[in-house]
Amino acid sequence: MRILGIGYEGLCKFCGLMDMPSFLDKSTHTILLKQILNCSKTVAETFMMKAVNEEKQAMTTTENEDINHLTVSGDGTWQQRGYTSSFGVSSIIGYFTGKILDINIKNAYCKLWSSGKMEVDAMVEMFSYSETKYGVKYANYIGDGDSKTYSGIIKSDPYKNTTVNKKECIGHVQKRMGSRLRTLKSNQKGLGGRGKLTGKVIDKLTVYYGLAIRRHCDSIENMKSAIMATFYHYGSSDEKPNHDMCPKGEESWCSYQHAEARGELDTYSHDYSPLPSDVLKAIKPIYEDLSNENLLSRCIGGFNQNNNERFNQLVWKICPKTVNTSYTIVQIAAYVAMCIFNEGINSLLVLMNTLGLNCGPNSHRYAERMDAARMKVADKRANDNTREGRLQRRHQQIDILEAAMTGEELLYGPGIDDSV
């Protein structure tokens, strides 16, 4: 029941509705929780040690001279945002295996520190004992830039003679473009509205900014050129085409270059309205700032924190954010989620055996079936065509929403019902 996110009260309700006697009192339930915590921690630590060894083995296939210098991504997740969260979980995941190498579960009533400060402390701790715990150094850190985690790691100087290098999560770098454009639109009048910086246009520019980085993450110059190509592309018109920086050839994403390669420029017409000059002038500094070499150098390699975020979601499925909880429950959820994340549902059978529970053939068949389905979903997510399809469907939804907002009066928004 704990794995299902159901606690003592839920267990009592289930027994009552199923006409079963309540076979546990509160104190016995607490004792059992401690046993589950101890066993889940033991199993999780075994799997994390295995993951570290797999990550080191994967390092032997690279040109890195020291297999003990690992590249990892780190992220933190908290039961509640801001100053009210008492519990949080931070994770470190290996770049090559995509498996969790370490987790740190924090318990603090945030009267003085925000969740961000707890994340910094948790990450610094995991870096500080990586050598004694695993015999490795986290030499390259993939972070989101949303907190002061990296500066905290640098200040703590965990490895003395080894500097920890920062790599940016491309997903979070991409979000900066959307955030900057929305802030600009909000602060500067006249940039929004039809034919200008609508929500759809901002989303498009943000997505293409991210794609420019992802598709050219092996070169700073190529990234910078690709980013500025998207800027000039959306400022082009039939009268003033400006596609010199767009990739050439029939395979180009730029319809103008595609038409030129096929010798069809005489009949070509832009299928979109160019951004007005005042909008282009306003957003150009943002493009220049977000294509600076210092930032793009940290994007070399095309890293992300997607695995950390998937782990975060798994933790709160086991320990829902909507339900009051305790430190023990959060710990159990984190360790169990870590086991499932690294080894699949089969890891739960290992945990049950550690608790002294016998697993029958139905349990094994269920674990095999669920793990097979999990692998199928993972393969589907990794498919580039599927990802492009999701982006296309998202833009179609934005089109529908904008059409509805244009054609109807505003029915929902801040201040709409102030007259009542």
Predicted regions: what they are:
Residues M1, K284-I300:
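Extended, non-catalytic structural segments that build the interaction scaffolds
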Residues M1, P276, G301-Q305:
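Amphipathic, non-membrane alpha-helical segments in soluble helical-bundle scaffolds
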Residues M1-K13, L17-N140, S147-S273, P285, ...:
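RNase H-like nuclease fold core
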Residues E9, C110, S291-L295, L314:
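General secondary-structure edge motif
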Residues E125-Y129, I286-N292, N308-Q313:
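Short amphipathic alpha-helical segments, especially helix-boundary/capping motifs
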Residues G143, S147, H172, N306-Q313:
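Alpha-helical transmembrane segments that form the membrane-embedded catalytic/substrate-binding core
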Residues L280:
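Active-site rim beta-loop-alpha module in soluble metabolic enzymes
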Residues N294-Q392, Q396:
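Amphipathic alpha-helical/coiled-coil segments positioned at domain termini
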